[in-house]
């Protein structure tokens, strides 16, 4: 479904290209749940933004079903990728239903008028994340976990085959992290979505994701494999473990 070829990602500074990672070759298939992990500064957010077109790669190409992403209009891209970013929801005076309805923007007219089908998709998306009964509540009245589910409902309402999430659990307590984890599993398994998310929640990622993308620090590349494969190879331990904690071959974190 998604293919990245010779992808180099990074940023521009003082007229120069500063590469964070180079020559990445990656694929994402429908129904896959992929956790993108790595130390701070290894390029996780930059990679997500480069894949979905929010940030141009330094070189290389991203393809969706063999069509280069840079040949598509923004409207076409918005029907392929929905993105949930890290920052808090700051739309204080909007109701949940209004926020989720923004996901229908790629399909509505220039006035944003919702048809019957749009309203049905919005309600189905809210129901999918367990937030339909909150539709008329103000977003400012919700907990962090509830806000995050609203943003995922917005991504679902966008009706794209691919959902990308940047640190979706960053503001959540443990119970809400587990709820989110199960929801992402369901989107991939039951709806056939390709779900790629970055996270620092190592234990949850290793226990629930079918595939891991491990970004090595200092531009050291990206390793791919199942959690079991990368744990048995010791790659995750080499990347993350220090004198304060260790990770065993079952993906359990042990504090020393």
Predicted regions and their residues:
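ABC ATPase nucleotide-binding domains
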Residues: 238-256
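The feature captures the beta-strand-to-loop junction immediately N-terminal to the Walker
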Residues: 37-39
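Helix-to-loop junction immediately C-terminal to a conserved catalytic motif
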Residues: 52
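Conserved ABC transporter NBD signature motif
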Residues: 60-68
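H-loop/switch region of ABC-family ATPase nucleotide-binding domains
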Residues: 199-200
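Conserved ABC ATPase signature
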Residues: 138-142
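Catalytic Walker B motif of ABC-type/P-loop ATPase nucleotide-binding domains
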Residues: 163-167
């Amino acid at each position: 479904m998604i293919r990245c070829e010779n992808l180099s990602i990074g940023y521009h500074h003082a007229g120069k290209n500063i590469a964070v990672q180079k020559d990445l070759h990656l694929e994402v298939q429908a129904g896959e749940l992929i956790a993108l992990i790595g130390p701070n500064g290894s390029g996780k957010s930059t990679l997500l933004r480069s894949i979905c077109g929010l940030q141009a790669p330094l070189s290389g190409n991203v393809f969706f079903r063999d069509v280069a992403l840079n040949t598509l209009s923004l409207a076409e891209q918005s029907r392929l990728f929905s993105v949930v970013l890290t920052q808090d929801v700051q739309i204080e005076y909007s109701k949940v239903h209004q926020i989720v309805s923004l996901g229908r923007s790629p399909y509505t007219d220039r006035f944003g008028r919702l048809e019957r089908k749009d309203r049905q998709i919005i309600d189905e998306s809210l129901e999918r994340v367990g937030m339909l009964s909150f539709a008329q509540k103000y977003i400012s009245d919700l907990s962090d976990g509830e806000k995050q589910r609203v943003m995922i409902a917005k991504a679902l309402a966008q009706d794209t085959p691919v959902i990308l999430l940047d640190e979706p659990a960053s503001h959540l307590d443990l119970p809400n992290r587990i709820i989110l984890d199960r929801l992402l599993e369901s989107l991939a398994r039951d709806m056939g979505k390709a779900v790629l998310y970055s996270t620092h929640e190592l234990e949850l990622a290793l226990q629930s994701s079918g595939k891991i993308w491990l970004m090595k620090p200092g531009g050291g590349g990206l390793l791919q494999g199942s959690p079991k494969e990368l744990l048995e190879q010791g790659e995750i331990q080499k990347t993350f473990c220090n004198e304060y904690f260790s990770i065993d071959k079952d993906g359990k974190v042990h504090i020393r």
